[in-house]
């Protein structure tokens, strides 16, 4: 494939994929305006956020499987098209109920395009160039998530909250046009296996129950959701072990590299989201910073995270996945020690150094985690593997938000995050080099 076509492919995929994290974080600054428009309580409005997160978590592993069945390019196109239509629906919604429905459809579109864009890259980009391309994606996605609230606030101040959905449409239209006209032709090994409907429903029930448990505020909720988890999760595992065509092939986890790469991204995302969620409150309470200044300080974390993602991608072939992921968690341990010291310090310089180290740690290993998760998987299973990786990544953020809700006191939280980073150091030791991982794949 020529360099021109390859870059057309990458830009098209990135245009679609970058809008998913932007729309995930941009909505946060719009909740008050949406509440005023529909004259609804903030508790009701938060379902605009919650439904997006739930549907994304439920749909991603299924979307990866659909890509392997019907073609990753086909599912990517459906994802971009659905995201475009849903964005239009969100912008024009006359009621909160319809806005929530279109946000759910937006999440389905995002879930379809995210794992399938990764699978397409696996098919058409040479193995040697994969880390650099994934690094480019990580840089874009990281900046998208970091800049989402900033972009959203500018749009809302200049126009209205509807504009955060209108802005998606031209970019999605370009991505769709580019994908239809400039995508290179390549052979996809489509799976003839049928979709496991029962397994999909049990997986959905399991994930929804877990998410609702972490977000529960009702006194009866803990009992009800715990019972549902104890019902759905064992039934899902039993179904997947017995069916001939599982929605998640647990044989993939026989590879220690695949397992540890997915555990690594879960632990990494857990700590990253903990910083993003807790540090604004910490900086306000501990340092007396206002919302604007704490947001600017936190942007330092996001910028260094995105930059180190790119650096980690460049170093992947030179150092290998294990060393880079080990370095990532070791730096996270150092950052969490600094956060612990901040509990008794009021030095802004010390705060900035902590955020810089935390950002570097959160970004440098992401590309190696992604590449390692695919290294032991046949190309025909790339969609499923990418869906699993995305789901593990998402569950890290779910666990993080649950921890913050359950734990009182910054010192205790930073101690737990330090312990998580040490666990990550040991998990990284189970990741093999790319060459060893390929041998592991062939012998599986």
UniProtKB/Swiss-Prot annotation:
A GO BP entry is: transmembrane transport
Q: In its keyword annotation, does this UniProt entry include Cell membrane?
A: yes
Report which superkingdom the organism of origin falls in.
Answer: Bacteria
Q: Where in the cell is it found?
A: Cell membrane
Q: Which residues cross the membrane?
A: 9-29, 42-62, 82-102, 104-126, 136-156, 164-184, 193-213, 217-237, 263-283, 295-315, 324-344, 347-367, 387-407, 411-431
- State the UniProt keywords alphabetically: Cell membrane, Membrane, Transmembrane, Transmembrane helix, Transport
CC terms in the record's Gene Ontology section: plasma membrane
Pfam families assigned to the protein according to its UniProt record, in alphabetical order: MFS_1 (PF07690)
Q: Name one GO molecular function term.
A: transmembrane transporter activity
Q: How does it sit in the membrane?
A: Multi-pass membrane protein
State the family named in the UniProt similarity comment for this chain.
Belongs to the major facilitator superfamily. TCR/Tet family.
Q: What is this protein called?
A: Uncharacterized MFS-type transporter YvkA
Species for this entry: Bacillus subtilis (strain 168)
